Amino acid sequence: QFSLGVMYDNGQGVSQDYQKAFKWISLPAEKGDAKAQFFLGCMYEDGQGVSQDYTEAIKWYTLAAEQGESMAQSNLGHLYANEQTDKLDYIQAHKWFNITGAKEKEKIEQFMSPNQISEAQKLARTWINEHKDN
């Protein structure tokens, strides 16, 4: 199902159709497939095959990120750091950048207080400790 959705998304062997891609990718995402959840997050973030919805993007990225999908973790950091969205949250951005080891965390620190940085680092450490067996 996921592969068929990606084929529709890319127009590989079928006519490109973002709505069909969304339909086919949603099925495994709903069943817990992390790659499909990540892909669905991208579709919501970009408004591809579905209306753009940052809340839904965060939901799907988070589900994938909790399973260790590193690209979803990175995208969460970027989404939370994006001033163009209504989801701006430097603490969450820093947390996810910490988890992925992304250098972007240093860029957003200029907008954060020392307490916020400390809180983000604590959240990242807690998350890593809770997921170290995954």
Where are the regions a protein language model picked out?
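Hydrophobic face of amphipathic alpha-helices that form TPR/SEL1-like repeat modules
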Residues: Q1-N10, F39-D46, N75-N82, E106-K107
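Canonical positions in the second alpha-helix
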Residues: L27-P28, L63-A64, T100
